[in-house]
A protein has these predicted regions:
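Conserved redox-active cysteine motifs that mediate thiol-disulfide chemistry
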Residues: 63-79
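Bacterial N-terminal signal peptides
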Residues: 9-18
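Positively charged n-region of N-terminal signal peptides that target proteins for export
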Residues: 1-6
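The C-terminal output helix
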Residues: 161-166
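N-proximal helix/coil linker or "cap" segments that precede and/or mark the start of modular domains
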Residues: 22-39, 169
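A short beta-strand-turn-helix
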Residues: 41-57
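Short pre-active-site segment immediately N-terminal to redox-active cysteine/selenocysteine motifs
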Residues: 56-59, 64-67, 126
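Thioredoxin-like thiol-disulfide oxidoreductase module
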Residues: 49, 82-160
Length: 169
C-alpha cells in the first residue's frame, strides 16, 4: 500500500501542475493566426529586390516560423501597431520569410533556400530574426530578438539615419 500512496500522490501533483499550466496558458497574449490581417504590406522577396533597383529603399526582412510563438506575438502586437506599420510601408520594402522554407531566393548574391540563407549566409540561429538588405541585395545587418512596438520603431528610425550610406552597398 505505501507504493500505491506514492503513485497516487504523484498523480495528484502532476494533475495539479497540468491544470496550473493550462490555466496560465489560456491567459497568454492573443496571437494573430492570419497574416492577411497585418497592417504591414508584406512583399515577396524577389519583388522587393526588383522594386529596389528602380526605387532604392532598404529591405526589411522578417524571418519567422510557424512554430515560433514569439514570432506570432510580434505579428499580433508589433506589426499591427499603426506607427510601425506606417514606417515599414512607406520607408522600407517589408518582406516576411519562413525560416524553414525550402523556396529558393538570392541572398548576398548566392542562390539558396530560405533556410540555408537563414543559417549559412545570414548566420542566424534564433527567431524572431530580422535582416536589413541593401537595394543591391547584400545584407547589412541581422537582429535576433523579440521587440515591443516602441523598440522596433526606434530601431527602424536608426536604420533610416544610416539609409543614404547603406543604400549604395
Amino acid at each position: 500500500m505505501p507504493g500505491l500512496k506514492k503513485i497516487l500522490c504523484s498523480l495528484i501533483v502532476l494533475l495539479s501542475f497540468s491544470l496550473a499550466v493550462s490555466a496560465t496558458a489560456s491567459k497568454g497574449p492573443v496571437v494573430q493566426k492570419n497574416q492577411d490581417k497585418s497592417l504591414v504590406q508584406w512583399m515577396d522577396y524577389g519583388a522587393a529586390l526588383e522594386k529596389a533597383k528602380t526605387d532604392p529603399k532598404l529591405i526589411f526582412v522578417d524571418l519567422y516560423a510557424d512554430w515560433c510563438v514569439p514570432c506570432r506575438i510580434m505579428d499580433a502586437n508589433v506589426y499591427n501597431n499603426p506607427t510601425v506599420a506606417s514606417i515599414l510601408n512607406t520607408q522600407f520594402y517589408a518582406v516576411k520569410l519562413d525560416a524553414d522554407s525550402q523556396d529558393s531566393i538570392v541572398c548576398d548574391a548566392k542562390k539558396n533556400t530560405v533556410q540555408r540563407c537563414y543559417f549559412d549566409v545570414w548566420e542566424l540561429h534564433a527567431l524572431p530574426a530580422f535582416v536589413l538588405v541593401a537595394p543591391k541585395g547584400m545584407s547589412i545587418l541581422t537582429v535576433t530578438d523579440s521587440m515591443s512596438p516602441e523598440e522596433l520603431r526606434y530601431m527602424l528610425y536608426q536604420f533610416l539615419e544610416k539609409e543614404k550610406e547603406w543604400i549604395s552597398r
